[in-house]
C-alpha cells in the first residue's frame, strides 16, 4: 500500500492551496453543549459522546456553492460500536441537498465502515459503503469533499468515490443550493454496526473524535481524476467497497423499485 499513498493534490490535479480556518471564528456548535470543545489556538475541535449527551455537532458559519472542503479527523479508538462520526455538506429544508461521509463504529479489531450518500432535493438512496484499508484511529487523516458542477469526488489520500453530474439522462445533481459544512458524533446503535446487532457499550464511554485543520476553498475548478487517480479509484472499488446501490437486489428484474437511471447507463 505504500506506493498507493499519493497525495490528494496529485489525485485531484493540482488543486490550489487554501489557508486553514480557525474553529473559534468559523464554526458554530449546533448541539451537545460542552461535549463540543474547541482546543488550543482554534485549529482542533473535540466531540465527545456519553450517556448524558448522545453526542455533539457543529457547522460552518459560511455556506458555499461548490468548492473543496478538507477536514483532518481522528476517529474513536477501541470499541466504537454503535457510534457514527460524520463530515458532510448540507443545505436546509425538506428539499435539501447533502453529500455525506459517515464513519460507522466497530468492535475492537474490526475495520471501520465508511458510508457515503448523495441527496438531491431531499432524495437520497445513492449509498456506497467501504471498509477502510487503514486504521483511522491511530493518526489524523485528511478527508476531502470536492464538489463542482461536473462531479463530486470523495477522498482520503486515495479517491474513494466519484458521483458524476448526469442530469442529461435524468439523474438529479446538487448544483443550485448553497450548503454548509457539518460534523457530528452521535449514537446510532439501532443501525450503525452490523445493522444494529452490535450495540453501544456505554462502559467504554466517553467516546471521543477529533477534528483539525478545517479548510474550505470556495472557488471551484472543473476538476476530474487523473489517470493515476482513476486507477486508484478502481482499486478501492474492487478491494474495499462493500455496498453499491446500483447492485442492490431491491432493483432486480421485476422489482417495484427500479434502479436509478445512472445504474442503467
Please describe what each predicted stretch is.
Residues 2-265:
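GH16 jelly-roll
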